[in-house]
Amino acid sequence: MGQKVNPTGFRLGIIKDWTSRWYDDSPVISGKIKEDHVIRNYVQTRLKREKAGIARIIIERTTKHIKINIYAARPGAVVGRKGEEINNLSQELGRITGKEVKIDVVEVVKPEIESQLIGESIAYQLENRVSFRRAMKMAIQQAMRAGAEGVRIRCAGRLGGAEIARAEQYKEGKIPLHTIRANVDYASVTAHTIAGTIGIKVWVYKGEVLNQRIDAIEEEEMKRIKERRSDSGPRSRNDRSQKRRRRPNDRG
């Protein structure tokens, strides 16, 4: 059943981190989760016209302000001339949330191996009546050339305008879904065509990652073992001999 699990959720807390990095134990936590969803949708739709290529959006919160990290293939499109676009975006989000919003833009070095950008590129081509096979094969070739160790793309729906919906997928390299230390980037995108919607799923294997989280967990386990040993203390030879003598009597 490993193939049915979301690869990102399967690795959360080990080699993957949450996209909403804040903590709140108050009853209004549901409102903040909804607010994060609204922020992501607004940023995606707002920057889609600029063709910035948004790979992911990370939201951090404090008591006074909200910090948004936008990972973009074209950061210049997000910032704009003399920072006009980013200032306007922060003001618009400030009016929506009612808090001060700070935006940082991070450039995506290799957009060819970002699953979200691959899915959006294929969706754009399908909406413009490009052959789905051509779009999928081209995306896989570009990702493998850029350094990906494995790519799998699956399209499902009325492919090519067919009356009966079906699913087709192409794969190159390896995609280890059960190996937790394997850095598998996953995304799901929907293409809105004349014939109907087409679901696009993308898996990109970027290699194994031994994160500091794993090392930290191992260090904590070693500390616990040492503490248990120190609490129990070293046993003397007399204690051991007494236990050995007691064994026959206990059995009898």
From Swiss-Prot:
GO terms for cellular component: cytosolic small ribosomal subunit. Keywords: Ribonucleoprotein, Ribosomal protein, RNA-binding, rRNA-binding. Residues 221-252 are annotated as: Disordered. Part of the 30S ribosomal subunit. Forms a tight complex with proteins S10 and S14. Residues 39-109 form the KH type-2 domain. One of its GO terms (molecular function) is structural constituent of ribosome. Binds the lower part of the 30S subunit head. Binds mRNA in the 70S ribosome, positioning it for translation. It comes from the Bacteria. Belongs to the universal ribosomal protein uS3 family. This is Small ribosomal subunit protein uS3. GO terms for biological process: translation. Residues 221-241 have a biased composition (Basic and acidic residues). NCBIfam families: rpsC_bact.
